């Protein structure tokens, strides 16, 4: 099941999220849109298991990486509204 993974321009390019991901969803690429000149897009969101380890690993005050779980997953976890 695919989840939505969003990388924000507050990314500092530290690679912590990339290293924390157990399914290699993230990878670092050059990007001029942030201070670090690199960002971790999520080219393989279909492999995301929704563990949010990337979020936990992010050292920025405003999480630069966010995982939005699909409706089915949030419903099964009892988190749906």
UniProtKB/Swiss-Prot annotation:
Residue sites binding [4Fe-4S] cluster 1 per the record? 11, 14, 17, 58
- Report whether 4Fe-4S shows up as a keyword of the record: yes
Please give an example of a GO cellular component term from this record: photosystem I
- Give the SUPFAM superfamilies listed for this entry: 4Fe-4S ferredoxins
Residues reported in the UniProt entry to bind [4Fe-4S] cluster 2:
21, 48, 51, 54
Q: Where in the cell is it found?
A: Plastid, Chloroplast thylakoid membrane
Top EC class for this record = oxidoreductase
The cofactor(s) it depends on are: [4Fe-4S] cluster
Q: Does the keyword Iron-sulfur apply?
A: yes
The EC number on file is: 1.97.1.12
Give a short account of what the protein does: Apoprotein for the two 4Fe-4S centers FA and FB of photosystem I (PSI); essential for photochemical activity. FB is the terminal electron acceptor of PSI, donating electrons to ferredoxin. The C-terminus interacts with PsaA/B/D and helps assemble the protein into the PSI complex. Required for binding of PsaD and PsaE to PSI. PSI is a plastocyanin-ferredoxin oxidoreductase, converting photonic excitation into a charge separation, which transfers an electron from the donor P700 chlorophyll pair to the spectroscopically characterized acceptors A0, A1, FX, FA and FB in turn.
Listed name of the protein? Photosystem I iron-sulfur center
- Organism of provenance: Chloranthus spicatus
Gene this protein is translated from? psaC
